[in-house]
């Protein structure tokens, strides 16, 4: 038995072996195993991916001006005008000096941190920060500690103990945490940062951009601290129904990354037509207020009912609603039951979440109805 077979067998024995699902999409439904199920596992938070009118309007407006491929890195011949137009729009909306686009949120996080951190840098990351952030931290080679989740007293203790030994310290967090749906207190993080002259703040808004804030600019808008975050990162593959990621930052940081960030320098750029689609939707973000309010209403209903039924505390304040069951097999069996009832939800198991907290992760979208949510609740 080779090491690959052995490892796969071990994963199967502990209920952690994964496989790619064989599914088809029909609007807010998915079809798998001959079952038609309401999709409760999508990150299409505003329901834009299924909005045929938006797609039709975009296709009518785009003409033949945007190629289907960039065929090059942006530093060679892949820097099409739509990239610069979109970065200008991002900077204007966030009222920051500049913005920079990337191929994905993963590319952003594994590229920015290694570019800006070195042996004279200390990184302090939230214990539940996304895997892409942790990978970026490890690739950077910088010293790092992971502070207890959303525990700013622990973070402050680490700053007091270690900050003077380093040229710079970077605090790294998500704004909305992807597995628990809870929120970082960005105001408190900004206040901590301001107590030190060598501290920078890196915030990943992947699950917040588009969904929160009056203009849809994420939790940094909600907490009114956009100007205080040194590296404000977000993605387009969730609420914005597209692909890619962005950073809004000072112009000096943008220029530095163009010269040092390997995933940017050595990757073929996103297709211009893809960037044009993202621009088209991002430009409309302030107009999606009704979608955001509807999504929050649905989320509140489900959070209330999950709290009544779960033995575990529910920390979520967002449209990501975990139903923690504990053991892997419990989560697998409950997911299978709900799928048979017509609700496509998936078990989330270690190492994605801590041991003993296997769960179903309900990811709600604005194209769901209150009736959809009540039907799900009746099966919990």
UniProtKB/Swiss-Prot annotation:
Disulfide bonds: none annotated. This is Putative 8-amino-7-oxononanoate synthase. Homodimer. Substrate binds at residues 18, 130, 352. It catalyses: 6-carboxyhexanoyl-[ACP] + L-alanine + H(+) = (8S)-8-amino-7-oxononanoate + holo-[ACP] + CO2. One of its GO terms (biological process) is biotin biosynthetic process. The keyword Plastid does not apply. Belongs to the class-II pyridoxal-phosphate-dependent aminotransferase family. BioF subfamily. The modification N6-(pyridoxal phosphate)lysine is found at residue 238. Its cofactor is pyridoxal 5'-phosphate. SUPFAM superfamilies: PLP-dependent transferases (SSF53383). It is an enzyme of class 2 (transferase). Its EC number is 2.3.1.47. One of its GO terms (molecular function) is pyridoxal phosphate binding. Keywords: Biotin biosynthesis, Pyridoxal phosphate, Transferase.
